[in-house]
Amino acid sequence: MLTKVVFLFFWSRSDSTKKLAACNHATLAHYILTPALYSDACAIYSDVYSITIIVVATVVRNPARCSLRARKFCRLFSSFFQFHYLKELFYFIRKPDDKFSSFI
């Protein structure tokens, strides 16, 4: 049975901070790379098996770098949970001050 998978991106005002967390329905495990202060949040939903994933990322000033980071996060989780299928997420920052980025 497929369950909704949640990708949450919390935007930080600093380019250097990164924090990432993963959870499933039974347990919540946090994988913290560096502390981050969150200002805004967006979410995108996709159906992939029965694991709920929360990915926490930060805004960087270069849109190409943001897109690359999103793909790296997806590859990391695809490998970590051994998914057979995981769509890559691309997000593009219109400008650093935008509250929310656009997803495709």
UniProtKB/Swiss-Prot annotation:
It comes from the Eukaryota. This is Uncharacterized protein YOR072W. It comes from Saccharomyces cerevisiae (strain ATCC 204508 / S288c).
